[in-house]
Amino acid sequence: MKKTLIAFFLLSTVVAMAQKPRPDAFPPVPDTLSPKAVTMATTLEEMDSWDKYPTHEVYIAMMQRFVDSFPELCHLDTIGTSVQGRLILSLAITGSSDNDLYRPEFFYSSTRHGDEVTGFYLMLRLCDTLLRSYGTSQDITSLLDRTRICINPLSNPDGTYRGGNHTVVRAMRYNANYVDLNRNYPDPFGTDPLEPLQPENEAMINYVSQHSFRLSANLHGGSEVMNFPWDSYTSFEQLNEHHEWWKQVCKRFVDTCRLVDNQRFRDVTNSGYIVGGDWYVISNGRQDYFNYYHNMREMTMELSSSKTLSTTRLNHYWQCQSHALINYIKEIHNLEDTSTVGIVAPVVNMRVYPNPTTGSVTIEGASASYRYDLSDRPSGVYILNVEGRHVKVVKH
């Protein structure tokens, strides 16, 4: 027994030394960022230099200006509202060619943890770059003509603007109910979260259910590493079926960033990427939920070692990561069956019926057909168990 305990201790020590703990493994610490390190843009014109964070009012105005300036390329969707009534917005961007039916849908979503605002800034700048480059950059024009890109720069506005709409200095991880939104999704492998499903997450689930996203990423901060499924298991316990694909995608992302700054993405693993559960096992996370239930491949991008970068460093992070962020969108065209968006497709132990139904749906089992009448049910997403496999039905 003594030898076993010693061996366990030595193994635990080696593992702990091999990689940095996940930033959300520890309790929150008091605010340490000096207000002098953060400059806020109080007008649209001040934001044009891209060396500031926007106030909440400027953020909303920026999203509207994208639509006003490029109405033929984008429109604004309201995903929902936060606990305190702030809008959760998504900008849908696509080109003007005629093959709209066959464009796969891509999704970027940032700042689920309100104090991790690097992605917030990067997503706003990405929106601006995609729109301004259409028609002048052959690469971007081709991408938009073949892809529908939805970008949600800020998914936890109450956490980001906890100190008031004028500043991000006192941003916090949680929403206004002090719930960690990345521990609040239904867990396909475990139990439901302790807290009720929060308005921000309910809105996000409904929004994703109305789309056919094939590839997505949610953006975080506090470390620099590409975190791919599963979060609920170590790679020893259960490999994601796309494990090797994820490794190659992550490697391409990291390698692209290191062409600009070779020191990036080294504070967790030397490779710059890791299976989420190998870093730190969590339950009720967004990544596993969307991968399992929504026929989409989503990863977690930890983009900066500092959760809230000083504004003097923002431009460097954009220069380092912008090409990688764009190239990740292009990965959607390397997926199998990209042209069959909206068609029934197998995913692990689940089949997905994404086409809306207003009444009954018939699902083919191995030995029989099963009819489910949803006519008296409210609109929403239904996860049904048919002969031991999960089936998703979306009702409008």
Outline where the language-model segments fall.
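Active-site-adjacent mobile loop/cap segments within catalytic or ligand-binding domains
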Residues: 216, 221-239, 274-336
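Soluble metallo-hydrolase cores and metallopeptidase-like ectodomains found primarily
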Residues: 54-106
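Positively charged n-region of N-terminal signal peptides that target proteins for export
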Residues: 1-4, 395-396
